[in-house]
């Protein structure tokens, strides 16, 4: 099973520009989590912080119990071997064919024979649907194939944690769905902890077990998918429905005057874009028939059962419906905790009120209640920022700079064309 990743009080700035502050969450081991947010909210910066490519000013990052912000360079080098990373642009070496791209981490970081390397590479190419394309250069294949090649390379060291940065970037909706299915199947096959950074709504609704959202330098919330997908938080509803009505604007944030003006236009009959509000929970993608049963499903159901009484009422209802409709052959029996679920309400001794986002603080909605999962509704700031671009093309998908031979900072090589 993949390892647990936990961050506590994480704050990152570029100079005087604060990217996000006091971010705390836990990625449950072996589950698929997604981090959402408008463009420029620091989602990719968060990924790079998890593997030590960027160093936050404050906080802790625990990878399998080790704080990578306090460990030695040698320890960090070893911890990075737990990771597989799919960067937004694939980060393939343009001068290498797909076979050599996928083989690169094995040749760079192991002493395996070429026969063993070939066996592993072909296995990962088959898993990602690239058999027959191994001799092609990155410039000769489609964007979707480049994504899958980057994913194959991220898998060759048998990672326990897979970080995926914008898997839908540059892809049409259909290819994005295929990539999403591949990620679910990989989780079923190797039981790795997966974190996907995205602002793709369909992916957000259908893929992850857990969802978080960054906005205005804060983690708005993080928890079981049902919490965010049933949330009445304005920024969450706006984001999930892709509409102009809400606090997100072209410059990341809006003032009250702009929000009032846009609402007046809608009231006058102007279409605000986006889709009609989606009611209820869209079913989560399942592993392809023939792949192993996703063990994460059972672990997650057991975990959310333990915390369900602390969740908003709408999330409780959605979770209970999910438990009631679970295939009996899958994993989990009906809920049997201290509370009881009756006629659309969750009743527990001493807890009769209906939960909503405004009541989170009254439910112990913080680290003490969730074991550092930090399901918090942090206050929003007022000023926006633009996220400085980061060049990933010099890194291989194990989280190393391509070409370095020690735990220090070596030169990047073989940048993709």
Where do the model's predicted regions map?
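Conserved ABC ATPase "signature" region
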Residues: 66-67, 114-133
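Conserved ABC ATPase signature
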Residues: 137-141, 145
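Catalytic Walker B motif of ABC-type/P-loop ATPase nucleotide-binding domains
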Residues: 162-165
